[in-house]
Amino acid sequence: MLGLYLSSLFFAFFMAQVFATKYSITFTSDEYEEDETGQNEPGPLVFHLDKNSLPPALLNQMEFNPYLVLADLPEEPRAVDSQEHTDTVLASKSVIDFLLEDPLTIVEHKKFSQIESILHEIMEDSIQKKVGADEVFEEIPKPKIYAYEDILVTNMSIINNSEMPTSTATLTSTISYLSSTTSLALSTGVTSVEIFPTITPGNITTIGGYENSSSSLMPSMGILSFLFGLYLLLHP
């Protein structure tokens, strides 16, 4: 009864679609006639469809309905249901497991040499097609391999700094207001020397914490102070 109810429900929905889009169908209920025992044995509904009046999406839904039989369904690819998919996976897995148990049986099989020769022919044909098409392949440069040899370096002539001969020279520089004297020791073979002179102050006078090298600063300041005081006294 459940199957009949589902079939009737689907048929009602289908009829609504037909009235809406003008599909051409024929329905028969001969499959639901009571048998000799008086029991209503559920059976599928049979539809005769117009192949050009239904969209592919609706045909796909009707094809996989277990309570519908489409007598003249258009020739379309049929999808595999879940049970068929499970059976196929189990069968393929069992075959793979059987082959992996003893790989030598594959090589010794009489079909193996035939398959191998076919694969070789396919590879040769593909190579000939590439050569015939004059395809240019850029050759990848081969990596260069360098050989390295460990060489032990030994220094046979080591000179200590204490043994190097030295000479002492005194440099004296005289400037108008500075005098410096620097003594330095030069090692044999030295071409550059940094000189840090010792500066001796000359003619430097300290006034109020500031240094000035002029010896006539005090008289000048005295004269300026006297003139500034005289200006303050005479200015009204």
From Swiss-Prot:
Q: Which segments are removed on maturation as propeptide?
A: 213-236
Q: Which UniProt key words apply to this protein?
A: Cell wall, Glycoprotein, GPI-anchor, Lipoprotein, Membrane, Secreted, Signal
Note whether Glycoprotein occurs among the keywords: yes
The signal peptide here is 1-20
Positions annotated with a glycan in the UniProt record = 155, 160, 203, 212
Name by which UniProt lists this protein = Sorulation-regulated protein 2
* Gene Ontology CC terms, in alphabetical order: extracellular region; fungal-type cell wall; fungal-type vacuole; side of membrane; spore wall
Q: What membrane topology does this protein have?
A: Lipid-anchor; GPI-anchor
Renumbered to this chain, the positions carrying a covalent lipid of the kind GPI-anchor amidated asparagine are 212
Modification(s) after translation: The GPI-anchor is attached to the protein in the endoplasmic reticulum and serves to target the protein to the cell surface. There, the glucosamine-inositol phospholipid moiety is cleaved off and the GPI-modified mannoprotein is covalently attached via its lipidless GPI glycan remnant to the 1,6-beta-glucan of the outer cell wall layer.
